[in-house]
Amino acid sequence: MDDRRAIPIRFGEFVALSAAMMSTQAIAIDAMLPAFPAIVGALKVGNPNHGQWIVTAYMAGLGSGQLVWGVLSDRFGRRPIVLGGIALYVVAALVCGLTKSFEALLAWRFVHGLAAASATVVRSMVRDLYSGRQMARVLSLTFVVFLMVPVLAPSLGQAILWLGSWRYIFIACGVFASIVWCWAFLRLPETLHPEYRLTLDPVHIFRAARLVVLNRISMFYTLAMTVLFGSLIAYVGMVQQIFADVFHRPGIMPGMFALCAGFMGVAAFTNSRLVERLGMRLISHSAILVFIAISALHAAIAALGWEHMWTFVLLQAATMATFSLSVSNFGAMAMEPVGAVAGIGASLQGCISTGAAAVVGAVIGRDFNGSTLPLATGSLWCGLIALGFVLAAERGRLFQQQHAGAG
């Protein structure tokens, strides 16, 4: 389906606004990365590794909140849910900036993530309007714009730290979300057709969720996304410690993080240009195999003690590029069979992929030992497990051709 003419917003602005709403999720993580040592010191946290909990608490809220927002968006429409969620996000960000204890910060970071989860409704909006390879193209273009945040946010966070307190980073997140809220309030259309609105009847919700869970393609591609997201969360949680404790160059972390994110952006843009011609399966299946190969090479280099800052950056950038090519298409393929219940479908998939990924990332992150080996081996295992889920989805055969509109 392609209903571009049915909504009072141009295609380019819809992509940009969708990316801006999704970016509220990322900026709350990426802008905080340079501030971990300052927060740990200011709030008197004993174990420096516990700074990663700032990400973990947020991701836990992000995962659990998606199910709630998705169900509500299927009942009340996409627009009011997105606007309400962003408003709560602004409040949570400001309160995080005022907290006096680490425990209170973690509690409000959970709320912060809970509110940020409303932006996942954007995937439902895209599914309302597009399907198949067109949907994959729109999601890839959205991802390209969205990736400007991890490119710029760490440098923004570092600049704020140079000028003042880490608390101002949370305030900056709130200001950014306020601007996005105003844009959405003025321009965001309602994409859910009235006849597709569902009741809040628990039986109906259960049936819709059952449709998602029991669909082989939807569920196994969701699980493949989950473990790959886990490797990304581990990287985000560990990157500041890696540059500080392994390479002793904490000051260049924002720039190197931006470089890796830039590779993700290039990959997402490339996907948007090629996916309608080559198909989601050819691109994503090739990408996951390359992801595994790069992770294996990285793990070997780290195990042999040959790791250098530039080997880490280049291999991690390549890993992130293949991650982008894999996940953007996995997400589109997971959504394709559940268009009739897109809100519940996107929220359930997001709840599983984000919530479980936070656990995977925490498990990898807790093993940080002053080297890059835990991250490299963790990424390798995540890639292998993701490949297993892809094989389960495709009944053991990669690169299967689908009709042009679907895969």
Where are each of the predicted segments found?
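Conserved MFS/SLC helix-loop-helix module at the cytosolic interface between two early adjacent transmembrane helices
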Residues: 63-103
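C-terminal transmembrane helical hairpin of 12-TM major facilitator-type secondary transporters
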Residues: 282-329
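Cytoplasmic helix-loop-helix junction between adjacent transmembrane helices
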Residues: 108-146
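Helix-breaking motifs and short loop linkers at transmembrane-helix boundaries and internal kinks
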Residues: 45, 77, 98-103, 115, ...
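Extracellular/periplasmic helix-loop-helix junction of adjacent transmembrane segments
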Residues: 35-64
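Juxtamembrane intracellular "pre-TM" segments in multi-pass secondary transporters
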Residues: 2-8, 189-221
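Helix-loop-helix hairpin linking two adjacent transmembrane segments in secondary transporters
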Residues: 104, 132-133, 137-186
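Structural signature of the two symmetry-related core transmembrane helices
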Residues: 80-95, 174, 283-298
